[in-house]
C-alpha cells in the first residue's frame, strides 16, 4: 500500500520541533544568566532546563502557532516567561539588562547556526526548505523580543536606560502594550521591521 504524506503537513511536522527548541533555548538563556547572577527563582521552578515542555504556554506555544501554521501565515508564538527577581542580583541594573538580552541573543546564535548549515548544503538539497523557516524564525525572535514594548525583553533594557522621571510614564503605558504592538504591526513601520529581518537573513544566507 502506497502511503503519501501531504508536503505541507510534513513541513509543519519538521518545523514544530525546531520551533519549540528555539523557544526553550530563549527561556533557558534567561534562566541560566539569572542563576549565574544570584537569582534562583527560575531554577527553583524547574525552568533552568532546555526541555521545551517546561517552557510551554498553552496559548502562545500551541494554539496560536498551530493556527498560524495551518492558515499559512507567518508563525507567531511565545513561551511561558521565566520568572526573574532582579532584587537577588548583585548589580541589579547591569545583571537585569544582561539577563533580558540573553534570550534574544541566543536566538541570533541559533540563526547563525542554521545559516552555517544552510550555506554548507548543496543548493539543490531539499533540507534547505525545512531549515530556512526556523532560520528566519530565530532572526524574527531576536529582533521582535528587542522591541521596547512591555513585556518584551527590550522593554526591560529601556526601563533601565530611561531617566527616573520618565520611568513612571513608561510603566503606566505597559497596560496598553498589546494595543501598541497591534498598531505597530498594522502600521507602515512594520515593513521596516520586516526589511530588517530580510536584510539580516540575506547577510547570513544568500540562496
Model-derived regions, located:
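Hydrophobic transmembrane alpha-helices and their immediate loop junctions
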Residues: 1-207
Amino acid at each position: 500500500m502506497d502511503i503519501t504524506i501531504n508536503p505541507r503537513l510534513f513541513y509543519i511536522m519538521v518545523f514544530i520541533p525546531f520551533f519549540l527548541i528555539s523557544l526553550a533555548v530563549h527561556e533557558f538563556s534567561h534562566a541560566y544568566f539569572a542563576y549565574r547572577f544570584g537569582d534562583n527563582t527560575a531554577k527553583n521552578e524547574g525552568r533552568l532546563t532546555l526541555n521545551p515542555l517546561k517552557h510551554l504556554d498553552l496559548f502562545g506555544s500551541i494554539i496560536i502557532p498551530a493556527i498560524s501554521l495551518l492558515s499559512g501565515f507567518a508563525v507567531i508564538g511565545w513561551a511561558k516567561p521565566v520568572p526573574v527577581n532582579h532584587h537577588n542580583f548583585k548589580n541589579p541594573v547591569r545583571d537585569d539588562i544582561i539577563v533580558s538580552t540573553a534570550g534574544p541573543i541566543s536566538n541570533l546564535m541559533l540563526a547563525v547556526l542554521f545559516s552555517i548549515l544552510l550555506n554548507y548544503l548543496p543548493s539543490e538539497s531539499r533540507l534547505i526548505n525545512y531549515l530556512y523557516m526556523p532560520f528566519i524564525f530565530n532572526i524574527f525572535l531576536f529582533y521582535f523580543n528587542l522591541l521596547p514594548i512591555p513585556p518584551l525583553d527590550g522593554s526591560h533594557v529601556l526601563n533601565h536606560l530611561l531617566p527616573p522621571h520618565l520611568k513612571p510614564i513608561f510603566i503606566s503605558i505597559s497596560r496598553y502594550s498589546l494595543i501598541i504592538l497591534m498598531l505597530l504591526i498594522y502600521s507602515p513601520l512594520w515593513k521596516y521591521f520586516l526589511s530588517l529581518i530580510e536584510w539580516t537573513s540575506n547577510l547570513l544566507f544568500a540562496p
